[in-house]
From Swiss-Prot:
GO terms for molecular function: rRNA binding; structural constituent of ribosome; tRNA binding. This is Small ribosomal subunit protein uS13. Belongs to the universal ribosomal protein uS13 family. GO terms for cellular component: cytosol; small ribosomal subunit. Residues 94-122 are annotated as: Disordered. InterPro entries: Rbsml_uS13_C, Ribosomal_uS13, Ribosomal_uS13-like_H2TH, Ribosomal_uS13_bac-type, Ribosomal_uS13_CS. The keyword Ribonucleoprotein applies. Pfam families: Ribosomal_S13. Gene3D superfamilies: 1.10.8.50, 30s ribosomal protein s13, domain 2. Part of the 30S ribosomal subunit. Forms a loose heterodimer with protein S19. Forms two bridges to the 50S subunit in the 70S ribosome. Located at the top of the head of the 30S subunit, it contacts several helices of the 16S rRNA. In the 70S ribosome it contacts the 23S rRNA (bridge B1a) and protein L5 of the 50S subunit (bridge B1b), connecting the 2 subunits; these bridges are implicated in subunit movement. Contacts the tRNAs in the A and P-sites. PANTHER family: 30S RIBOSOMAL PROTEIN S13/40S RIBOSOMAL PROTEIN S18 (PTHR10871), SMALL RIBOSOMAL SUBUNIT PROTEIN US13M (PTHR10871:SF1). It comes from Syntrophotalea carbinolica (strain DSM 2380 / NBRC 103641 / GraBd1) (Pelobacter carbinolicus).
Amino acid sequence: MARIAGIDLPRNKRIEVALTYIYGIGRSSSQDILQKAGVDPNTRTDELTEAEAGQIRDIIDGQMQVEGDLRRVVTGNIKRLMDLGCYRGLRHRRGLPVRGQKTKTNARTRKGPRKTVAGKRK
């Protein structure tokens, strides 16, 4: 099992798909990495030679922010917005949608389960 960026890649998948198991690498990024390394995207992970795995490792370590570093940057950006007190920061702080979505009926993912309020007595 190839281990790249601290992640065990699945053996039986194509290397193009297996690289997407690393946080911060999607399909297009994995295709770019494989093209730079000169590795065929259809190669299975267990068929990789040690030299090819080393090339992929060097490209990812040298040119990309992945896993813990990327998570730290993202949380730092959100924290910065919250400290600034800008609109986006306030939305993050309140746990509401940040990008202008309506909240009257939807936004359950951000708001969590409904807090039922008792109806008015007549």
